[in-house]
Design a protein with these regions (language model features):
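Conserved N-terminal segment of class I S-adenosyl-L-methionine
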Residues: 1-167, 181-186, 200-201, 214, ...
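Active-site micro-motifs of SAM-dependent methyltransferase domains
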Residues: 156, 175, 204
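Helix-to-beta-strand junctions that scaffold the AdoMet/dcAdoMet cofactor pocket
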Residues: 177-178, 191-193
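Conserved beta-strand signature within the Rossmann-like core of class I S-adenosyl-L-methionine
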Residues: 194-202
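Juxtamembrane/transmembrane-helix boundary motifs at the membrane-water interface
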Residues: 209-217
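Post-transcriptional modification and biogenesis factors for structured RNAs
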Residues: 227
Length: 262
């Protein structure tokens, strides 16, 4: 089905942006105003297939590449927010294997072991999972108690969410939002007033102008990825639910602050 309004900014200037391949035509739509891209609702995978795909994700802390990816997200987010020290942290959309929570718990334990870790400020020198933990243990001046670092996922941990946290981490989740406004509303409801939301997702590169450009972009090939953002689309989604855009912590990390009266 065609969208009468953009799912991201609400503008009426939405046009077909199909991807044509040997397998056929996959329907996407793009907004002329915010330039975000949505997969047509009729192309969304059934829930059972989405769950099967999520279970295939290799989100394992023993994988150095993935551990380094998580470390980068934490490092850039906390660097941007400094000197803010969260009193609670929620991993929103933590999946079947809450690796980000596990990493922060390991960092907290390392800190509690009376500083028995290698003290390094060289992010580029990290070359092992242990060094990921050591680096964050030294870099993060404060973490809340373990029970105040928790996760929630609509499929795998629907009862995990406790009280709203004052730091909500949302890594590789926003691209799965079938309805971005609803997704952002969930993030806002999970955050305390004056708290922060950090969203990690790969934005649409400036080089993607035509649907032929988009066809070659690898990030769309995961069929559970249905929403693709520009920075402007991020800003507009935040406006719908009282999340004020603060800027980018890195090219793929977007920081918001929950307004006190939202």
């Amino acid at each position: 089905m065609a969208f009468s309004r953009c799912k991201f900014c609400g503008d009426s200037g939405v046009f077909p942006f199909p991807v044509i391949s040997k397998k056929g035509v996959t329907e996407y739509f793009r907004c002329k105003e915010c330039m975000a891209i949505s997969l047509s609702d009729k192309e969304h995978l059934p829930l059972s297939q989405q769950l099967a795909r999520y279970r295939q994700h290799n989100n394992n802390l023993n994988d150095f590449g993935y551990a380094h990816f998580l470390t980068s997200f934490v490092y850039h987010t906390f660097s941007f927010l400094a000197p803010f020290a969260p009193s609670s942290i929620l991993d929103y959309g933590c999946g079947p294997n809450p690796a980000l929570i596990d990493l922060l718990h390991l960092v907290l334990k390392r800190q509690q072991d009376h500083g028995s870790f290698t003290k390094s400020t060289d992010f580029n020198g990290i070359d092992s999972v242990e060094k990921c933990i050591d680096f964050l243990a030294f870099f993060l001046s404060y973490l809340p108690k373990q029970e105040l670092i928790y996760g929630w996922d609509p499929f795998f941990s629907p009862n995990g969410k406790k009280e709203p946290a004052n730091l909500v981490l949302c890594l590789e989740v926003a691209e799965h939002f079938g309805n971005p406004w609803e997704g952002f509303s969930g993030l806002a409801q999970s955050c305390t007033a004056e708290g922060y939301v950090a969203i990690g997702t790969l934005p649409i590169p400036d080089s993607i102008v035509s649907n032929m450009d988009f066809k070659g972009w690898w990030y769309k090939d995961d069929k559970t990825h249905v929403s693709f953002y520009t920075e402007k689309a991020m800003v507009e989604c935040g406006k719908t639910c009282g999340l004020r855009y603060m800027g980018k912590a890195s090219p793929r990390i977007f920081i918001f602050k929950k307004l006190g009266d939202a």
